[in-house]
């Protein structure tokens, strides 16, 4: 195992940030992610979990926020409903440099928080 990263996002605080800066959605999330959450009655908890996943990836790699662009790592959903990380560009280069060959991700949101756990191996 290379590393583990966990991140927690306060959903209402994240909602306020998205409301205050509407362009943030497109800056932080890929079209794939935005399409996935579009039919949800309240997409913000799912978006918060996906944001947490990006930060958890950076932590799993031992890096700080801003180590790579937000569109260089994102969450897709398998036909089974399981989340799957897609890591490209600078994020992929950093992962390869550290010997990462496989990713695992778990997302959840309940009540006031969204959480993501990422394992890089």
Language-model regions, residue ranges each:
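Core catalytic alpha/beta fold that binds nucleotide/phospho-ligands
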Residues: 1-121
């Amino acid at each position: 195992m290379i590393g583990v990263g966990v991140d927690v996002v306060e959903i209402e605080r994240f909602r306020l940030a998205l409301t205050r800066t509407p362009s943030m959605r497109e800056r932080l999330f890929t079209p794939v992610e935005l399409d996935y959450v579009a039919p949800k009655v309240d997409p913000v908890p799912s978006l918060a979990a996906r944001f947490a996943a990006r930060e958890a990836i950076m932590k799993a790699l031992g890096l700080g926020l801003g180590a790579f662009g937000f569109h260089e790592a994102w969450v897709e959903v398998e036909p089974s409903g399981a989340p799957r990380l897609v890591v490209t560009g600078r994020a992929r280069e950093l992962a390869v440099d550290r010997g990462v060959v496989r990713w695992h991700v778990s997302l959840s949101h309940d009540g006031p928080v969204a959480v993501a756990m990422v394992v890089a191996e």
